[in-house]
Amino acid sequence: MENNLNLCNQTNYRFRYKKDFQNILDEIALFFKEKLPLELDLNIVDNILIKKISKQYYKKDKETDVLSFPSELANMKNALGFFHIGEIFLNYEKVILQAKEYNHSLKREFCYLFTHGIIHLYGYDHVKENEAKEMNAIVESIMQKLNIKRRK
């Protein structure tokens, strides 16, 4: 079973973590015991585009780090022979800033937010404290399995 990550870099930023992201997607499939291959669309964007998307779909006029949109095709996964879980928009400018703020490596921050975005596609959220703990525990377990550490 091969999971498919469709990457669209809509910036001039030289993105270096596709292999790491593919490993994360593979680990997610194992974690959720998926029987069909996963397919995910990933867009690397900047502050301007993510702010526009956030305003249009969430009515929030601000930049954010990651936005996740579940797939309309999820109900058709058996007919398609794969599970298209959705689309993620990852703001590289915010990722770089947050890596510095949290004293994380750039790889860690990119991987953490990518994983966080996927977990949202599975219906998890962090509005309530108990939900946030559960969501973060899943993300951290994926980071540990792939030996992606917090520090530089």
Swiss-Prot record:
* Entry GO CC: cytoplasm
Instruction: List, in alphabetical order, the Gene Ontology terms for molecular function in this entry.
Output: metalloendopeptidase activity; RNA endonuclease activity; zinc ion binding
Question: Binding residues for Zn(2+), per the UniProt record?
Answer: H116, H120, H126
Entry keyword Nuclease: yes
Function per UniProt: Single strand-specific metallo-endoribonuclease involved in late-stage 70S ribosome quality control and in maturation of the 3' terminus of the 16S rRNA.
NCBIfam families given in the database record: rRNA maturation RNase YbeY
HAMAP family in alphabetical order: Endoribonucl_YbeY
Q: What's the protein called, per UniProt?
A: Endoribonuclease YbeY
**Native source organism of the sequence:** Mycoplasma mobile (strain ATCC 43663 / 163K / NCTC 11711)
Q: Which lineage ranks, top first, belong to the organism behind this chain?
A: Bacteria, Bacillati, Mycoplasmatota, Mycoplasmoidales, Metamycoplasmataceae
